Amino acid sequence: MATVTAALVKELRERTGAGMLDCKKALESHDGDIEKSIDYLREKGIAKAVKKAGRIAAEGLIFDEATPDHKKAVILEFNSETDFVAKNEEFKEFGRKLVKIALERNVHQLEELNEAQVEGDKKVSEALTDLIAKIGENMSLRRLAVVVAKDGFVQTYSHLGGKLGVIVEMSGEPTEANLEKAKNIAMHVAAMDPKYLSEEEVTASDLEHEKEIARKQLEEEGKPANIIEKILTGKMHKFYEENCLVDQIYVRAENKETVKQYAGDIKVLSFERFKVGDGIEKREEDFAAEVAAQING
């Protein structure tokens, strides 16, 4: 049997919201496999929702910007070890400079950005090494997305002082009214964290996985087989409402309208949402010791 560590219990607790003892039991019965433990907790109805992102840990900032004509936008995650360095003006200036490079040159991948010239003959990767040496803390360019509008426009939104950024690509013309509407939709993406744009983006495997979880929940509740299939239809509709951007209830709506309805005669074509540290493991803090004490106690 795999050793169930305090860190594993902590992660499972963060991702499911389940109690500490439930998390410990789930991990012990599934040899420390966190994904299987999540499914088990959901099947038992102990975990009502799962945060797919996992641990949120690394410090840094999200930089985003669009061209004046709103035909191209860039979003970049630039990480540091501490929040103190993320507030450093040299750190912020370097991030802004890199976004400008990606916006103004033919840069679409992080590898291309690292190879781009930033100061004379110096590459971005070399300039970053210099900055690390100067400030005395490790930093990294984690991810980059470049969105080019073919038949519509793009809009950006930054939240939490640069800790979260969003790009939305829309159909239509970048009129003042449409840009305002697009920014509101980007704010919705920041707040509601949709996993897909629409039902069409949900893969068959993802859908089947959700159905299986729901089916086992209903079986645990003792529902008869003929009723389960009917209930599953409603549960899948709810899944789309909660996870697909265009089907979500618009966060500022007063009349329960969906994002698609709010968008009206323009359509959401794609979106990018970056939050600092999504999925990066952080150093264990005192909470891990607390968990360990309860496991071993």
Swiss-Prot record:
Keywords: Cytoplasm, Elongation factor, Protein biosynthesis
GO MF, one example: translation elongation factor activity
Disulfide bonds: none
One GO process term, biological-process aspect: translational elongation
Annotated segments matching region Involved in Mg(2+) ion dislocation from EF-Tu: 82-85
Superkingdom of origin organism: Bacteria
Family matches, as CDD domains: UBA_EF-Ts
Tagged with keyword Cytoplasm: yes
SUPFAM superfamilies recorded: Elongation factor Ts (EF-Ts), dimerisation domain, UBA-like
Chief location: cytoplasm
Record's GO cellular component terms: cytoplasm
Compartment list: Cytoplasm
InterPro entries, A to Z: EF-Ts_dimer_sf, Transl_elong_EFTs/EF1B, Transl_elong_EFTs/EF1B_dimer, Transl_elong_Ts_CS, UBA-like_sf
Function text: Associates with the EF-Tu.GDP complex and induces the exchange of GDP to GTP. It remains bound to the aminoacyl-tRNA.EF-Tu.GTP complex up to the GTP hydrolysis stage on the ribosome.
Family: Belongs to the EF-Ts family.
Protein name: Elongation factor Ts
Record gene name: tsf
